């Protein structure tokens, strides 16, 4: 069935159900960053395969909203579909909410599957529609009626994290959550975000692309926990571990009926940013809601000593794999064979190096491997259509990561494939200076992202340059690779949570020259407590990624003495930690690649 036919069939169903506008976002029932095959309804209906976008269909119009990462791809994939590309954030382009508000008729009906729309978004739409006496019909998955060969929900087996990996029992975590529930005056807490359930109960799965998470909902009561999940994914051992904490296993979709039984005296703690609109709408009127962030969001962001130890071990494996990869690239340049490789083949080779390390589970996100001008596209995703051959005297940006049994990694390196231009060297060096400034920063407890971001961006700002993305984000422990609540960005709205010892974040400044090259240099960093004195508790960042920077891409004359000290200190650590994991030839290369400057 062609895309035009699918849209026509959708309009037939809309007319049958009295729906004027139907919205299809990119989401699963848990607002996950990546979604499994079953949830790719927007891809099925539009033909657009990018990871972000929303399809809105009226009786005579269809539009696909996506951001700048995907404009070119969307243009190609939407051609001939009858769907207009709506370029988000471009002047004159309304948001989906603004479009719906303007185009819904008086007394009209907006339809969507309320399980894939957040409580917050659904509530906003509901408020906006009141001006036209319009309503929402949220219990309608019209795409499901069209998608005849829709993939089933994942049936992959779950696994359990023992305390030697998790560092804390589920019993202890539940005690902490119930304490916060009590302080909030709540006797029930609904958790729909997969990483929060995974952390709380020490369970993981393979139900979401790139993230080792389990499709599930959790409802925490004062004396037991209801876990809504496909029970066939659990071994007897997992069931026994859950039973110790009075976890009652129920069918995955039963939550939508069960919450209708909440009583008027119940007080329910919900996170509006994570709860889906269908669950919110099924909670009976009269039940009091306490709207605040899930307690687990901050709890899981502060890693315990066991998690930190395991994360560092994962980074040693990742560091060995990525160092082998850079050595492989440099040898291909030396032999004149680099042009035989492409972005996609190099990405596959890097993944193979990771697989060889042992304990590899899967990539932690869709790899970004951009050669030359493709490196200037911040969230570039190589495809058969865009795949470039690697050529000499250019830069190759690789932003990749892995989930190992001990933890998750996220690293970016930009590699010089031979002799590069003075401009490229200058740009690489400035970005490295941004990175080093943040790495060596010492600051007081209570400081948050906007404060430290000013230091990171300064070397570029002095030259009136910048990058249009955050300098850093939190990283989950076998959870989401982009984890809140802390981040590093000058925008207060995006990173207000103060840093706390035990948090793991990224340090990833960049510079992007359209049509020429892109540079991003990323390590993961651990927030560590240092001196405590009459002025307060001081913190610092410890790099926990162990891969050399590219000395062939650095203009040493631009480095300050502090830069050189920090660079040499880091390179000594990289050599000491990674050299034992390499072959004799690789070790000799690494010795030279980490020489003092």
Residue map of PLM features:
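Active-site neighborhoods and metal-handling regions in enzymes and metal-associated proteins
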Residues: 1-597
